[in-house]
Regions:
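Glycine- and aromatic-enriched mobile tails/lids
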Residues: 1-212
Length: 212
């Protein structure tokens, strides 16, 4: 009651892709709003300060742009903020080259994944200064922040699972074989919101349908 899930929390599948992610996210969000509008969440207490802090955080990219645009001396590149498209291009390059993208023939390994995590951490630092010139770009800015966090999660899980579980989707060049003895399991993670560090663990797979 009052818990809404999307993505792997409602059933893991390798074929969900981005379209499945945003579709399930939209469905979960609309269901949560309906839950609130129907007064089912009336026991949840939120202070005025919490609301104001949340609004300030959400609209910060608009402020970053308003201040930073005055420092532009030519073109559209600012020394004090990053635009959503600039951040997106960096994110795509990191995931493509270090986490088994098409230009790497879907191949990655321990060292590449660790370097990818380092570059993702740098990007997340820079996204604290993402700028948005209008509400559409504000949406893009937050979409980028969430995509970067999702990418970090994908990279952490790929590094933790020491095998190639999905040949064709990605390959661990240093762990090319399927290892059912050690890795016929689910991997779950918890992210510390204060430190950004992930804690990884294995969970058993329960087959509810016979393989035969």
């Amino acid at each position: 009651e009052g818990l809404f899930g999307a993505g792997d929390t409602v059933g893991g599948s390798a074929h969900k892709f981005s379209s499945g992610s945003f579709t399930e996210g939209r469905l979960a969000a609309k269901a949560a709003v309906k839950y609130i509008e129907e007064q089912k969440a009336k026991d949840i207490k939120v202070s005025e300060d919490q609301c104001n802090n949340f609004k300030e955080t959400i609209y910060k990219p608009l402020e970053n742009y308003t201040v930073g645009r005055n420092e532009i001396t030519g073109g559209t590149v600012s020394p004090s903020y990053i635009s959503p498209i600039q951040g997106l291009q960096r994110l795509q390059k990191i995931m493509d080259e270090y986490v088994g993208g098409i230009t790497a023939n879907y191949m990655t390994n321990d060292n590449l994944l660790k370097k990818g995590l380092e570059l993702l951490a740098w990007l997340q630092e820079d996204l604290e200064h993402v700028g948005a010139e209008d509400y559409h770009q504000l949406m893009r800015a937050w979409e980028l922040k969430h995509r970067t966090l999702t990418s970090q999660c994908v990279t952490e899980h790929t590094l933790f699972r020491e095998e190639t579980r999905w040949p064709g989707y990605y390959y661990r060049g240093d762990k090319l074989k399927l290892d059912d003895e050690n890795w016929h399991c689910l991997t779950v993670s918890r992210r510390d919101p204060k430190t950004g560090k992930f804690t990884m663990e294995k969970m058993p797979v329960y087959h509810i349908v016979d393989d035969e």
